[in-house]
Amino acid sequence: MQQNYRELWDETRYRKVLEIQHEDILSFIAGQLRPNNFAMQFFYGFNIALVVFFLLTISRDISVAPFSLFSAMLVFMAGIPLFLILLVPLHEMLHALAFFLLGARKVRIIPRWEKLMVYAVADKFVLNFREFLFLALTPFVLINLGLIILLFVIPGVWKYAVWSALFFHATGCIGDFALLGFLSRNNPLETVNYDDFSEQKTFFFEKITNVD
């Protein structure tokens, strides 16, 4: 049964560990970038692996492929609008789908163009750590896996547009990993969270374990 968010304000059972104003989410992310937890270590490791694989690919291609480095870079730049137009909305729609699969129905996708960010929230829907893990990783896994498959399917120079989209999406997932990193350092199995539309905030609470 879905937990009621009002239960989290019972100070005999839960303590509030974090309150994030949605307009301040970028400042919060900036404070979570150190690789001092598995989530951020994985994030940096994945992106470093992409860079290494990209350099190996382009080194091979410029010696044997029938296109120039300049052509590859032009196509790479063309992948930027591909990311902005297609993958940013898809990423948030997958977050919304994950919310829906978990049982949330009051889900919104909110653009904040002045801060160059888009995010999905579910009003007063309580998530435990496992549910938040599913929510955070659904777009990362599905989109990046799809793009990696496309690298081996799309021929010639055009795969560099996919490389561009993959780079931008993989690095753009940093907010999801920053939140996972925060949770992983703060008793994750006893921590829950929910979004509040009206206050434009996300709250994190930890269960007081010595209370039944």
Which residues does each predicted region cover?
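Metalloprotease/metallohydrolase-associated module, dominated by Zn2+-dependent proteases
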Residues: Q2-R60, V118-K207
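Membrane-anchoring/interfacial helices and their immediately flanking loops
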Residues: R60-E92
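N-proximal short alpha-helices
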Residues: S63-S71, V107, E114, L150-L151
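Generic detector of bulky aromatic hydrophobic side chains
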Residues: L86-V88, F99, R112, F132, ...
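Active-site recognition of the HExxH zinc-binding catalytic motif
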Residues: L87-F100, P139
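Catalytic Zn2+-binding segment of zinc metalloproteases
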Residues: H95-R108, N186
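Juxtamembrane inter-helical linkers in multi-pass membrane proteins
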Residues: G103-D123
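Short, charged juxtamembrane terminal tails flanking transmembrane helices
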Residues: I208-D212
